[in-house]
Amino acid sequence: MNKQDFVEITQRRYEYAMGIDSCNFDLLRSVFCDEIFMDFEDYSGKPAAKLSAEEWVESCKPLFIGLKATQHIMTNPIVEVEGNTASCQMHMQALHFFEEN
């Protein structure tokens, strides 16, 4: 992996956060290849799984549309590149603000 690989891969994580926080689901989709592996087991209790990027983006829409605001903060990226495959593992803090009634 060279420096440019690292920069481009970590840039995707910022686009991921911006896509979710702005409800720009086209931007969110553009971050991913067609098949992805997502691991939110610590959050949801569901085991990590492969799914299509479209499935992931569609599953995000009902979670974020209608919120007053969100902010996703990501740190400590660990990037690995092997041939044409890359992975990025990181910590994320997500803040979700609801409309007051």
Identify the residue ranges that each predicted region occupies.
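Short, cysteine-centered beta-strand-loop-beta hairpins and adjacent loop/turn segments enriched
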Residues: 95-101
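Short, low-complexity N-terminal intrinsically disordered segments enriched in polar/charged residues
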Residues: 1-34, 84
